[in-house]
């Protein structure tokens, strides 16, 4: 639940340079984390911006998603929340209803809400929050636009050079190899503390 930064400006010195490199390379998406900063953390700034934000999970945190990631770092892609953040691990916003939480996530800068124990989120909750005026129109427009753009840029629609049957055959042929490679890379990336 808690994210600890005991060293002053540790985020600027150690954690955020990797994210800045990803942003500079125009990465399509970044996943926010479920944890929240401890209230007793050392002072944290990035490029002069105070990021000693609210003690809520990043998916609910406008200071981190909007002010830091988008406005200061220049991120233009979509923000995908961590899984289960809406119902089971809503750190810092436990007192809010799921309806209030989903509205807060969109208004804070989240664009895609992660799954719930492997099941897709029922977006009727977002529609209800929007119809009740809980989600700002610009937040929903931003999230929808970023979702559609990411799908279109992934070359999945209306490509006159792509035949559906050829694409499905290629996917069937390469999916097992890609899955094996992804598992191998994930295994090699683990760090034992």
Please state what every model-predicted region is.
Residues 1-193:
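Glycoside hydrolase catalytic-domain context in secreted enzymes
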């Amino acid at each position: 639940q808690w994210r600890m930064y005991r060293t002053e400006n540790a985020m600027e010195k150690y954690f955020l340079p990797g994210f800045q490199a990803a942003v500079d390379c125009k990465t399509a998406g970044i996943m926010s984390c479920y944890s929240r900063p401890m209230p007793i953390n050392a002072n944290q700034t990035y490029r002069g911006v105070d990021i000693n934000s609210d003690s809520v999970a990043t998916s609910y945190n406008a200071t981190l998603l909007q002010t830091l990631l988008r406005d200061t770092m220049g991120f233009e892609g979509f923000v995908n929340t961590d899984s289960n953040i809406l119902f089971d691990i809503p750190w810092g916003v436990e007192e809010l209803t799921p309806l209030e939480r989903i509205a807060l996530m969109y208004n804070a800068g989240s664009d895609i809400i992660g799954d719930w124990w492997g099941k897709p989120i029922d977006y009727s909750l977002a529609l209800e929050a929007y119809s009740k005026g809980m989600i700002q129109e610009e937040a929903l427009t931003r999230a929808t636009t970023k979702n559609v753009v990411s799908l279109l840029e992934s070359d999945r629609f209306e490509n006159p050079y792509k035949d559906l049957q050829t694409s499905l055959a290629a996917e069937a042929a390469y999916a097992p190899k890609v899955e094996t490679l992804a598992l191998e890379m994930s295994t090699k990336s683990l760090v034992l503390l």
